[in-house]
Regions:
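Short, acidic/polar
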Residues: 38-51, 110-126, 174-178
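Active-site groove signature of glycoside hydrolases
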Residues: 123-143
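Alpha-helix N-cap and loop-to-helix initiation/capping positions
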Residues: 39-43, 71, 75, 106-114, ...
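Conserved beta-strand positions
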Residues: 29, 61, 95, 133-136, ...
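N-terminal binding-site loop/beta-alpha segment at the start of enzyme catalytic domains
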Residues: 1-91, 157
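N-terminal small/glycine-rich loop or linker at the start of catalytic domains
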Residues: 18-36, 94-107, 130, 135
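Acidic-and-aromatic substrate-binding clefts and catalytic sites of carbohydrate-active enzymes
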Residues: 35-40, 64-72, 140-144, 171-172, ...
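Beta/alpha (TIM)-barrel catalytic core signal, keyed to glycine-rich beta->alpha loops juxtaposed to Asp/Glu
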Residues: 2-11, 143-331
Length: 333
């Protein structure tokens, strides 16, 4: 019988999500990878236990996480039932809908029919009465924004979600969505977007600035750029790397000599700071207080502990930030 560590709240700081009442741990656990049916279940349990024992209260899922789609929610539901159910009121569980989930015209994008049906399915797979956050997973160019936001409002009013979130939106669409949700009195509190030293899209498309101005939180996924911002690729591509074993999310063509040189230069900056490259990459995201939480993935429990160590130093000098920009190709005169 699992008993959570009595010291679990002594490790991590918790950040307020925008101006809401919701607090997120500075580091959250994402179940995008390593929780599908191709992964070892006992290892999944260890990952979740290690996370919670060290103050990671937030577990982030989506309907399509796997492989196969739905399997991450199903496996998390089993972990919840066997280990975490007594701690439900200490957990922040999120899921999403927006990508292809089932065949036909009603299993994708942002219609009211799809989002509300998907949420019901997600709750059933996880064995939950509600999720804490329900996200629309991506912008839908063909469905009226009012319909999609109305579905999020219905999810909250029905008690099946406590808060609404948006994922992969840009600044302009976020602002429009926020106005609709405010008018509907829906607690929209958070944006989830890809963000790393190598991917600064949210700085370029206005999302980061808009979220801060509107007092909404941000949680960053892929903070290590699918493993590029670790020591895994300092000497080229390892045979057991994700590139070799699962090329869906990180293509071998991305790892050029130029990219390897950037990784090595960033690693030297990290070493000078007394950090690993991964620690520095996570700290960089949290450097200015504008990102509420950083979403990590893990295949081993030790990786969770290593990532938490990034919080030991999230302060950067102007020279360090300039060096990181130069090394990663983002420096502007």
């Amino acid at each position: 019988m699992y008993a959570a560590s009595p010291a679990r709240y002594s490790t991590l700081p918790y950040h307020r999500c925008g101006k809401s009442g919701l607090m997120l741990p500075a580091v959250s656990l994402g179940l995008w990878h390593n929780f599908g049916d191709t992964s070892n279940f006992e290892n999944m349990r260890l990952l979740c236990r290690t996370a919670f024992d060290n103050g990671i209260t937030h577990f982030d899922l989506a309907n399509n996480y796997g492989p196969e789609p739905g399997s991450a929610e199903k496996n998390f539901g089993r972990i919840f039932k066997e280990d975490l159910a007594p701690y439900r009121d200490e957990l922040l569980i999120s899921t999403k809908a927006g990508y292809t989930m089932w065949e036909g015209p009603y299993g994708d994008w942002g219609s009211r029919k799809y989002l509300l049906a998907s949420l019901d399915q997600s709750l059933k797979r996880m064995g939950l009465e509600y999720v804490d956050i329900f996200y629309h997973h991506r912008m839908d160019p063909n469905t009226p924004l009012e319909e999609t936001m109305g579905a999020l409002a219905q999810a909250v009013r029905s008690g099946k979600a406590l808060y609404a979130g948006l994922s992969n939106y840009n600044g302009e669409t976020l602002e429009k969505a926020c106005a609709i949700l405010d008018e509907l009195h829906v607690p929209f509190v958070i944006n989830q977007n890809r963000y790393s030293i190598f991917d600064r899209t949210i700085e370029q498309n206005g999302l980061k600035e808009t979220a801060v101005r509107l007092n909404r939180g941000i949680i960053a996924f892929s903070p290590l750029a699918q493993g590029l911002l670790t020591n895994r690729y300092l000497n080229g591509i390892p045979e057991d790397s994700r590139v070799r074993t699962d090329g869906r999310f990180l293509k071998e063509s991305v790892i050029t000599e130029e990219k390897l040189a950037q990784i090595r230069a960033l690693n030297e900056i990290a070493a000078a700071r007394g950090q690993t490259l991964a620690e520095m990459a996570l700290a960089w995201i949290l450097r200015d207080g504008k990102v509420t939480s950083v979403l990590i993935g893990a295949s081993k429990p030790q990786q969770i502990l290593d990532n938490i160590a990034a919080l030991n130093n999230t302060t950067f000098t102007a020279d360090e930030l300039e060096a990181i920009d130069k090394a990663s190709g983002f420096y502007k005169e």
